[in-house]
Amino acid sequence: MTSQISKALASVVSRRMMTLVLLVMSLLSLHAQQSQPTMEQQLAALQRLEAMQPDSIQPKYQQAVLLLGTVCSQPQSSKAQQYIDEAQRVIQRIEALQPTKAADRSDLATLHGFYYTAIIVTNPQQNGPRYYRQALDSFDEALKLNPKNALAQMLLERFKEGMVRNLNHSDHPCK
């Protein structure tokens, strides 16, 4: 009789513990989803870092990558042009530092290619013919300066894939 009571009590305790564990896991999961910083929060953090390190290229570079990446992932956003304009200002601040190292000049050329890519994705029909050569030339320059520039390699590959996709799915005269 005592063993039956012990088993029943153990079962109740076990269920309550399992419920408690599931509740804690749900709360942690919810907190993790809510605690992801927004793009604006990430940008503000990078701007604070830039203010602390005004002669450093990296905080500026990361800002431009964040802005242009956001445009490329959400090209129809109402803020796309605002982000492109801000990225252009950030790129100009990098240029003002007159980078001399090949890796820094490669990063700058990568940003130029990414900038033209962002302009193109907001309106491929109009901007593609106008800016595709600048984008390709910028990525090529970046890879000439630093063949190991992983971002330039990836962006060039995606750019070429996007060009092929647009040629195959449009009324392009070269088709």
Please describe what each predicted stretch is.
Residues 33-61:
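Immediate post-signal-peptide N-terminus of mature secreted/exported proteins
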